[in-house]
């Protein structure tokens, strides 16, 4: 974790991150975390750079040691209705509002912040710089991956556990072969094209 200079004059700081903007299926999942400065967690990093095993271990530790944590989400229908950017902002707002303690400042990964009731700051590549954002990225990633495992059990023919809903060659082939599920994001071009191809071959 690189040295990050926290803005001065704030008490409780929450980190917020999202997982699942790119996949073709399921919700975009966000997390908000307020860490306890007196109970540090070692090994926090961008969730994408950690093994699944390490993420699971850290997620349990974050939930145990954080002053507060919560998840937010926007479903595929909301993504289709609002677009992925606005749905992500909505999911971030939901995560922050669900915190049992309200933070004085929110640090958000990326270059945009949602409308919140407290000051917020966007930090580009924040999941590799800010411990709170790293913790949020880990919780969101673990939660979304578990949702894909569940979906995989319900619809094994799509192999969601392997590709986690991302637009891989395998996923696109399955979409064209079996059609789209209610959980698929119909506003995403690859899903639309796959539905057209599926309908054409029926």
From Swiss-Prot:
InterPro entries: RNase_HII (IPR022898), RNase_HII/HIII (IPR001352), RNase_HII/HIII_dom (IPR024567), RNaseH-like_sf (IPR012337), RNaseH_sf (IPR036397). Residues 11-200 form the RNase H type-2 domain. Its EC number is 3.1.26.4. Transmembrane segments: none annotated. It is an enzyme of class 3 (hydrolase). Keywords: Cytoplasm, Endonuclease, Hydrolase, Manganese, Metal-binding, Nuclease. Its main location: cytoplasm. The keyword Manganese applies. Pfam families: RNase_HII. Manganese or magnesium. Binds 1 divalent metal ion per monomer in the absence of substrate. May bind a second metal ion after substrate binding. A divalent metal cation binds at residues 17-18, 109. PROSITE patterns: RNASE_H_2. GO terms for molecular function: manganese ion binding; RNA binding; RNA-DNA hybrid ribonuclease activity. One of its GO terms (biological process) is mismatch repair. Its cofactor is Mn(2+); Mg(2+). It is found in: Cytoplasm. It catalyses: Endonucleolytic cleavage to 5'-phosphomonoester. The keyword Heme does not apply. GO terms for cellular component: cytoplasm; ribonuclease H2 complex. PANTHER family: RIBONUCLEASE H2 SUBUNIT A (PTHR10954), RIBONUCLEASE HII (PTHR10954:SF18). Endonuclease that specifically degrades the RNA of RNA-DNA hybrids. Belongs to the RNase HII family. This is Ribonuclease HII. It comes from Actinobacillus succinogenes (strain ATCC 55618 / DSM 22257 / CCUG 43843 / 130Z). The gene is rnhB.
